[in-house]
Structure formats: C-alpha cells, structure tokens
C-alpha cells in the first residue's frame, strides 16, 4: 500500500465516522465497513503457547464444531487475507471459498495461498456477504470469524448465508457481541461500546441475544451457544491486546510497522506514540492521516481491552447452527 492509498483510506474512514457522530444513528454501507477492517482475529490463550499456534487452534476448533469434512465445499464469510481459510483447508481437506469485499486483501490472500501451494484447494471471490453471488443450496458448510458483526443487520447477512447452504449444512460463527453483562445505563459501558463501534467501523455492535434471535429468525436451528471469551482461562483473551504480551511474543517491530500496513498486531500503540506520530506527520515524515489512524487504533484497543476486563464484550461468542433438512 502506498502512502497516498493509506491517506485515502484514512480520510475515507473519517468521512464515515466523525467524532461528533459517535452514536448508533449513523449507518455505514457494507462497502465502507469492510474497507477499513483489520486482517486478523483474536483467540483464546494458553500459557507458553506461541500466538500463531493459539490462532490456529482457535480456527481449528471452529472447523471442528462446524463438522467440516474432507472434500466438502465451504464458504468463509469475510475471509480477510485468507489465514483461517488456508489453515482450515490444511486441517480438514475441505475446499474453501473465501469471500471478501476488499480487493487489496484478496490480492494478498491469493498471493499467500499460491505461495502456500493451496490454490487448488482455496479460492477467493470479491463479493458482498449481504448479496452473495452463489446459487441457493451451494455450500456444505460455512463459517465466519469476527466478520459478520460488520453487517448493520444480522438478519440480512445470516439470511444470505442460510440461502447458499445446502439443507442440513452447518454454519459456525465467532460473533463479536456485547454480552448480557452490558448495561446501557452505565456510562462506562456506553463509552466502551462507542469506542469499539467507532474504532472498529461498526454501524452498531449487536448483543449476544440479538445474534441468537437473528439466527432463529432466518430459519437456522441453533445447535450450540458458547461464549469462549467468558471461559475461566488462565490468561484472559484481552491480554493479547497488551504491550507486555506482544513483546513476549516477539512481535514488537512487526506491530509498530502494522500501524501503516493494516495488519492485526497494532496493540503496542500508546499515547506516547500518538504524539510522536503527530509530530512526524507535521514534518511530512509520515503521510497525512497517520495521526488519525493511530487515534483510531488506540480507540478500538481501549474499547476491546476494557470491554474484555468488564466482561461486557466478547469477540468470540460461538454460535453453531444448522439449516434444516429439506
């Protein structure tokens, strides 16, 4: 990505999410929502386990719950740069179709998949998951990892997924939601919610109850519900958003570079770096818009971290559902 492209992305985002409009009243289009989305996801953590292994375990667990089998045709909704698609393809032997509306991410996904020697098994399409361009009853299964939360209306996206699944097929999702501990009358809770919405580019973050209701509303049979973020793990999931954790993982330099290359490991950004970036932007060392990008990162990280600590936000609310047999 060039500096001019980064500036365009930053300006485009902030035309959508202005500080004075940080409220549920503004509804972004799916194109606006997806264009600024980070490429990675969060996961549960285990002591002495490398981060890369934790991420893969999180993906494989979802594949297991969806019961993905060798040779099946599976769709990945909001696939990013294809890391879960490649991981699950290797793990299961299934044929994965990754769907994403971001052309730049798809170019990288195809390149990485070719380098991994998996192009025969994993393919990618540039499509909107609110208007999936596949026929009814096409896929043997579907999954989504922290992506369908970007849909303004969960019923709309879930209904499209339901449509393209074969009868009896399963859909598993790690949905990013507000938990039942969220209290809209609590000012701190509302601030956390706003920071997640504004920082993440969400039209509105849904509650766990809304996600479950949306599944049932479109016709899915809900087989399992499990908030993995609420598990009594030795290392809470939000720990991965902290500086000490990433430093231990050896991701410091990668994380700093990621601020400008839309990768996932951006949590090392802090208030001090905000000031430094602002100064370097003034000196034209960094492109225009860099300060806004850093402010954006700090906003969502603060929201997610505090949301995790308070138990009011989970990025891994697992729902496994099935399309009824014909």
Curated annotation (Swiss-Prot):
One of its GO terms (molecular function) is sterol 24-C-methyltransferase activity. PROSITE patterns: SAM_MT_ERG6_SMT. Coiled coil: none annotated. InterPro entries: Erg6_SMT_methyltransf, Methyltransf_11, MeTrfase_SMT, SAM-dependent_MTases_sf, Sterol_MeTrfase_C. Its EC number is 2.1.1.-. Pathway: Alkaloid biosynthesis. The keyword NAD does not apply. One of its GO terms (cellular component) is endoplasmic reticulum. Pfam families: Methyltransf_11, Sterol_MT_C. The keyword Methyltransferase applies. GO terms for biological process: methylation; sterol biosynthetic process. It is an enzyme of class 2 (transferase). Methyltransferase; part of the gene cluster that mediates the biosynthesis of paraherquamide, a fungal indole alkaloid that belongs to a family of natural products containing a characteristic bicyclo[2.2.2]diazaoctane core. The first steps in the biosynthesis of paraherquamide is the production of the beta-methyl-proline precursor from L-isoleucine. They require oxidation of a terminally hydroxylated L-isoleucine to the corresponding aldehyde by enzymes which have still to be identified. Belongs to the class I-like SAM-binding methyltransferase superfamily. Erg6/SMT family. This is Methyltransferase phqN. It comes from Penicillium fellutanum. The lineage of its organism: Eukaryota, Fungi, Dikarya, Ascomycota, Pezizomycotina.
